[in-house]
Amino acid sequence: MRASVTITRDLLLIGGGHAHAIVLKMWGMQPLPGVRLTLVNPDPAAPYTGMLPGLVAGHYQRDALEIDLVRLARFAGARLVLDRVIGLDLARGHAQLNGRPDIAFDLVSIDIGIGSGIAGIDKGKAWPAKPLGAFADAWEAFVLDVVAGTKAPSVAVIGGGLGGVELAMAMAHRLGGACPDRHAIKITLVEAQQDLLATSAPALRKAMRSGLAELGVKVLTGSAVAAIAGPRLYLASGDALEAEFIATVAGARPAAWLGQTGLDLHRGFISVDQTLRSLSHETVFAVGDTAHMQANPRPKAGVFAVRQGPILYHNLRAALSGGRLKPFRPQSDYLKLASLGGQKAVAEKWGLSVSGAGLWRLKDQIDQRFMAMLSALPAMAAPEMTHGLVALEVRALEAAQPLCGGCGSKVGPEALASALADLAPPRRSDVLTGRGDDAAVLAWGTSDRQVFSCDHFRAFSLDPFVMAQITANHALGDIWAMGGEPQAALASIILPPMTKAKQSSTVAEIVAGFEACLRAAGADLVGGHTSLGAELTLGLSVTGLMQGRRPLGLGGARPGDVLVLTKPVGVGTVMAAEMQGLAKGRWVAASLQQMLVSSRQASRLLRDHAHAMTDITGFGLAGHVQGLLSAAQLSATLDLNQIGWTEGAIDLARAGIHSSIFPETSRLANALQASASVRADPRFDLLFDPQTAGGLIAAVPAEALEALSKAFADHGLGLWVIGILANELSHSPTLTVTA
């Protein structure tokens, strides 16, 4: 999170294509100081398209062909923005995004590939092979339906290029192993041209046609698709065919928004020179299928994108530092390896073709080597040790786990309690409660109450807009926990070293993030303070009004109440793993999305029923439940099986990964009642995991559960019944954990 060199330039990578993935890897090995690197991609992972037929055929699991952009971005020190670019304002140097404010850049590179589909055909009726995520999910669901006997094993693949032929054979192979009646399988390959693989060498066409025939794939050439209605595909000839699953690898086309940018285009693709720079705009580079190499036109193939990666890396650095650019010289021909459904492949180069199982093994080795290059990242460098003689304990602290962001960066509960032990109680009559609860309660007018709280922490995400939203959501949690309605907020912003222009654009993103969350909560951002420091740190002071309701808080739980939870637990562990490059990208994306979910509706549903309520933050689930119990003088039992867990958190806890504050929060474990087997359960450790923008815990009467469960379900919200309070008061409340 620290920026040791002042940020002077913004480099924006649009799309997580193969060339950009290579740039990220190389940038992590040798970054350019002073450059803030940003990657924008809709998904946390990008597919390696060369292994797609193997996934469809069942040879690979999905993880095997996903390039984890979250891990690569962390390794490169880049911020990853999970969104879609919809336009470029090249005059201002701004990228326009689908769901957030513009991102400014000094230099931009575009590697977004191509889409597939047929004009006039509803996307919901035919599955494009790209993007991979939706296609893979739909295909796996279809295979399960075939196995269950609820759908017929009939498939149509639209597009007779190399990708379509490979896909048809892969589907035939997969269904052959999944369907008990092989004679029921019907795979049809539909091509508008008069021949398959029209641009391929005759030897390759012959081998692929032989593979199709061997697998029983029916081929229709000269058959343009006119329409799709239900499970029926209508051809321009008037003929129709039935298919329960329709895939399209035809109609490859560039992103429509490129046509609105003013860039020099060739049939919709960005025209670039030999250095991969736009012919019309020197601040724009393009690679992969997005680009048209004006001097050396080549077919759309992944091999060129992979080989462009190192040249692009060099040229981006050169353009940002005043160096000399290198030309990219593509080979005139290349080895084509195509799978034949099963574990066999065909190879073609210079018009010669050969096939067999050995070539599938060769293809697999090449593919696996490429994926290993992007996934086997070097260990992240440890912070530099202090030189010379140091005080006692310094070396041990330097060797400890790096400090987490969010609530993982907070002071531990024991140190905080000790520091506040001598704090005097409020002296003013209008300050009704002070420390000890989620928010202070102040008198407001003659009869109302105002609740007041603040939160700030070091950033765990390099995306200022998302980090600001999460910070605001977290700060508002104290207002929601009291049952209040947010009123106003003041911001505290610490920026790392950067030029004035970068300060302006970064603060604009932060303010937009604060505003997006606060406005949705019904509150106003009314001011704040900024300063420069070592790293990005954000905070908010927030007020809320009770509007005539009694403030909720830690006190008030009653014997026999049940404990309910409104969000899964485990984001602290996932984000700690992300900092170390150990979390899967989809886990990180799920955690970020979880932290962006507001507790507004949950608070409104709970506050009329709850006897006590708090939000889960830095002390973890166990620590905050213990706070409720101590205030009510009641014991309770928690059931690990009833708690919702953040995706990936259990796997990471099992691997021994924890937040940096875990040694402090887990000291409470000694006071809990639990069997040895429960303590050995990785979920037990997650009870002490700090939560940023965590959910609410409420003590509610058992008779309110049915109505609450229905109300939460009606609003699409989760509600977990995680425990029950004892029926009798206790001077030494204990928390018992079961599983």
Report each predicted region and the residues it spans.
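C-terminal auxiliary extensions adjacent to catalytic cores
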Residues: G342-R395
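Beta1-alpha1 glycine-rich phosphate/pyrophosphate-binding loop at the start
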Residues: R2-R79, E166-S200
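FAD-binding core/adjacent interface of flavoenzyme oxidoreductases
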Residues: R2-R9, G77-A156, A247
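A Rossmann-like FAD-binding core segment of flavoenzymes
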Residues: L80-R92, I103, H173-Q274
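Helix-biased detector of long, well-ordered alpha-helical tracts
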Residues: L389-A739
